[in-house]
């Protein structure tokens, strides 16, 4: 049964008291996390009312639904004649409120800090008068990428040309590099994947979902996590084995993400007899057998130029380096971003 929330001008005293209690609970946690994370620096976040959120999403109606992950759903909504992406976290008994509090406030505080970078989905505000805060982000016209590194337009998957895929890969790398280099404490995303990347009207990549992110102690290169968090197929095997998070945890995930964008295949595939195969093992096998043409998304083959084919080859080599077994053999994200910029420029320089 669909849950009903306080509607504009109609709530009972009990409902209003409940919303007020949520506001006080969520507000106190938010303030504590913000003060702890920002060292007194001001981060402006607009406060939206529950009436605005419910009106914008038609009480979270399926007609406004955009996409979802395990713990939340995205909705499209309009507030004051402006379109927004509205993120609503799950409230069911399986995920449980107390298990999700840290991740939710991680997402709010860190997203606010990233709002000055063009390759992060910009957090514009939130509403604290729900069991979990509802987050309001800038609108992304082309929505989120899917598990095949594509986007759905009018119910069908839209084929992204190679130049756009390379641009997206470069911009995701720029975003992760910013996390790793822009702050005194290195921030590790821990869940880099295409489904967390939104695309605006200009196909600019916007990385989102910082709920699993973790900061390394200042001056330290790793931290032991209580739980291994992330998405199957993208999780660094070293992190999975040891529970230690390093900047190379993100490098591995980005490498898988880049392979997905190149191939148009999901990170984990079902093959014969129901067995599973990862994109990494498939690409390694094809490259070892000299079958690069089978690595490239076959839908691109008829339009790809010889120069672009060289770009694809360079990107595949880079992605495989990101996924090396030993983290010391992987490049840092700043180097990955630099190489992708050079690969993108190579075609322009040769023409």
From Swiss-Prot:
Effect of residue 31 to E: Impaired interaction with RPP13L4/ZAR1 and reduced ability to mediate cell death
PROSITE patterns recorded: PROTEIN_KINASE_DOM (PS50011)
Active site per database record: 191
Top-level taxon of the source organism: Eukaryota
GO molecular function: ATP binding; kinase activity
Gene null: resulting phenotype: Increased sensitivity to the pathogenic biotrophic bacteria Xanthomonas campestris pv. campestris (Xcc).
Catalytic activity, EC: 2.7.11.1
Resulting phenotype, residue 240 to E: Abolished interaction with uridylylated PBL2 and abolished ability to mediate cell death as well as an increased sensitivity to the pathogenic biotrophic bacteria Xanthomonas campestris pv. campestris (Xcc)
Annotated binding of ATP, by residue: 66-74, 87
Tissue expression profile of the protein: Expressed at high levels in germinating seeds and at lower levels in adult leaves.
PANTHER family: SERINE_THREONINE-PROTEIN KINASE ZRK1 (PTHR27005:SF507), WALL-ASSOCIATED RECEPTOR KINASE-LIKE 21 (PTHR27005)
Record text on subunit structure and interactions: Component of a stable high-order oligomeric complex made of RKS1 and RPP13L4/ZAR1 which recruits Xanthomonas campestris effector XopAC/AvrAC-mediated uridylylated PBL2 in the presence of ATP to form a wheel-like pentameric resistosome; this complex triggers immunity toward X.campestris in vascular tissues. Interacts with RPP13L4/ZAR1 and uridylylated PBL2.
Record protein name field: Serine/threonine-protein kinase ZRK1
Species assigned in the record: Arabidopsis thaliana
Species lineage: Eukaryota, Viridiplantae, Streptophyta, Embryophyta, Tracheophyta
């Amino acid at each position: 049964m669909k849950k009903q929330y306080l509607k504009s001008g109609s709530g009972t005293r009990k409902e209003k008291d409940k919303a007020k209690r949520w506001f006080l609970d969520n507000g106190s946690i938010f303030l504590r996390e913000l003060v702890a994370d920002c060292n007194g620096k001001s981060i402006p976040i607009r406060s939206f009312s529950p009436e605005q959120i419910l009106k914008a999403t038609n009480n979270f109606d399926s007609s406004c639904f955009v996409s979802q992950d395990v713990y939340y759903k995205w909705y499209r909504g309009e507030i004051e004649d402006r379109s927004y992406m509205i993120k609503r976290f799950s409230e069911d008994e399986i995920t449980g409120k107390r298990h999700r509090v840290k991740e939710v406030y991680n997402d709010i505080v860190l997203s606010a800090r990233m709002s000055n970078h063009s390759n992060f989905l910009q957090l514009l505000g939130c509403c604290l008068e729900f069991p979990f805060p509802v987050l309001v982000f800038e609108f992304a016209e082309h929505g989120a990428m899917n598990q095949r590194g594509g986007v759905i337009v009018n119910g069908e998957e839209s084929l992204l040309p190679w130049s756009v895929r390379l641009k997206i890969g470069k911009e995701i790398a720029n975003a992760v590099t910013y996390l790793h280099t822009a702050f005194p404490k290195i921030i590790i995303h821990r869940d880099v994947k295409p489904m967390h990347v939104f695309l605006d009207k200009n196909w600019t990549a916007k990385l989102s979902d910082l709920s699993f992110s973790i900061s390394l102690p200042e001056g330290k290169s790793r931290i032991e996590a209580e739980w291994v968090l992330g998405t199957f197929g993208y999780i660094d095997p070293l992190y999975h084995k040891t529970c230690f998070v390093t900047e190379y945890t993100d490098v591995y995930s980005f490498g898988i993400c880049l392979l997905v964008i190149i191939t148009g295949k999901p990170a984990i595939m079902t093959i014969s007899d129901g067995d599973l195969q990862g994109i990494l093992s498939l690409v390694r096998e094809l490259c070892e057998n000299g079958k690069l043409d089978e690595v490239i998304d076959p839908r691109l083959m008829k339009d790809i130029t010889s120069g672009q084919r060289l770009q694809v080859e360079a990107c595949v080599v880079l992605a495989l380096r990101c996924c090396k077994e030993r983290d010391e053999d992987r490049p840092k994200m700043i180097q990955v971003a630099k190489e992708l910029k050079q690969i993108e420029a190579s075609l322009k320089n040769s023409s």
